[in-house]
């Protein structure tokens, strides 16, 4: 479902980056930590990328010599902190355009998304609802600090105009190509892997995991054009059977930036193009320090420990234990710095009850303990992190 790349967009970065800069970004951020060689090559003079297209099989981007000035006039649509206008005693986030992307959809779609959690009849939490509430409260706080704020999703409705039924043909092809030529149409009464091997499940996945994110990408890149996107999520640990979920003793926080591409992912021409577009536009130079500052603030406010990845699909980005590089569709498609937040474990018992309380100020009694609102902590952590970063790095 990806778009056919316009390789001329990469060629516009000719002479903008030295080989040393490219190699450092590739080795420290965009590649797997101990990954195999990528499906492109770079020499002392240029980067050479197979396009996967017959009309033009290779895209060639010259490097600039180490001591030469950049010969590219290519400018991204987003602005670094240092490129914002001087504050001149205005509110600290003045001129900064922030897009808030509330994760998932919520509402009646939450069960389909598998982001619906209930430990007792008549009560539940839905990640899409919680992320939208967090975004609306966060928007109010950021606007008070002078920011221009846009919501990527403004309601409990999908951004995409497509629906699961629109993907039945693609789903049948996916299953047929995988060796299942006669898949069941519905997963009614099925569980586990049997559920995954149905046209219904595959169609729903293409709807909410792929089509929805592509629609948000179009909105971000073509309409909003922000300086930064904050993707707001809540984490979860495995809770077992959805009809009889289990609480988890774990509660943690981590923040993601884009990176850590596997050679298999880069075999896809759209993924290869999107990764190189981010690398050559130097989005990581703003994204990682911004994410690090926000992560430090979130850690102070929430007092959550850092999540530890044990799988190869993520790697630490810099020295902060809370910040990881990972290749996700949202943080790859959005053509600007993206800070992707994953605080709190929804099926941690105290967190579950804090989130059921929605948003409140001060402290309230939960489980015999006075606690703050998890959403209020989430919002405060982000606001303090953004204030710290932009007050330090933009012209005064």
Name these PLM-found stretches.
Residues 2-103, 109, 164, 173:
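Non-catalytic propeptide/linker segments at domain boundaries
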Residues 15, 91, 124-135, 206-214, ...:
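Solvent-exposed, acidic/flexible segments
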Residues 84-219, 238, 248-252, 259, ...:
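Active-site histidine-acidic residue metal-binding/catalytic motifs
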Residues 97-101, 149-153, 227-232, 254-257, ...:
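Structural recognition of the beta-strand scaffold that forms the well-ordered cores
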Residues 136-147, 221-225, 234, 295-304, ...:
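Sec-exported extracytoplasmic/periplasmic mature domains
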Residues 145-156, 207, 229-233, 302-316, ...:
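Surface-exposed patches in mature extracellular/periplasmic domains of secreted proteins
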Residues 213-226, 244-248, 328-333, 338:
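Mature extracellular/periplasmic domains of secretome proteins
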Residues 238-239, 256-263, 268-285, 289-291, ...:
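Active-site-adjacent mobile loop/cap segments within catalytic or ligand-binding domains
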